[in-house]
A protein has these predicted regions:
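Acidic, two-metal ion nucleic-acid-processing modules in DNA metabolism proteins
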Residues: 1-177
């Protein structure tokens, strides 16, 4: 798999003298090669990447934000229901992503048998709190109370024991500098 301006297929073509066979397209490629050639293949792919001198590729790693919100005041059931009218989501019609640029971590709780999930309570500048959940979260999602963060999320409705609450499906969280 690839991302950004790096073409996986072009990288495979740059190593065509090392591989047995291969092919693909810009976003993904596959190869067959001898086990003893794995190191050579890895070096060639890295050399090819370096030769491109790509810059600012990090922008492709962050979720795109369809809407920036200043606070959580409009994150409610009505918003979630209106967003649901845009379904079905999928390729060509991605689910909208919201971004709050400044929020404080009020609490953090590890969940799951191995603590692999995280639940963050984020407070906006007006004191409103929204619970955010991420399943199989990377370690950088486990922020400490008091941390100031930017968060990318998708609003959802959680129904538990007959109680409906709006929360966020946390896609990414970054510590503010």
């Amino acid at each position: 798999r690839s991302f950004g301006d790096f073409s996986a297929a072009d990288a495979v073509r740059a190593a065509d003298d090392i591989i047995i066979k291969g092919g693909g397209h810009g976003a993904a490629a596959g190869v067959t090669l001898a086990t003893e050639k794995i190191g050579d293949f890895r070096r060639r792919i890295n050399e090819f990447y370096d030769s491109l001198q790509l810059t600012n590729q990090e922008r492709y790693l962050l979720p795109r934000a369809d809407v920036k919100v200043d606070d959580f005041s409009e994150i409610d059931e009505e918003l979630v229901e209106n967003l649901a009218k845009m379904e079905p989501f999928g390729n060509g019609n991605p689910e909208p992503v919201l971004k709050i640029t400044t929020a404080s971590v009020l609490s953090m709780r590890r969940m799951g048998a191995d603590g692999q999930h995280v639940k963050l309570a984020l407070r906006d500048n007006n004191g409103r709190v929204l619970q955010m959940l991420a399943f199989n979260a990377p370690e950088e999602f486990f922020r400490e109370p008091g941390d100031e963060v930017t968060a990318w999320f998708q609003p959802t409705i959680n129904e538990w024991q007959g109680v409906r609450t709006v929360e966020g499906r946390l896609l990414h969280v970054a510590l503010l500098d």
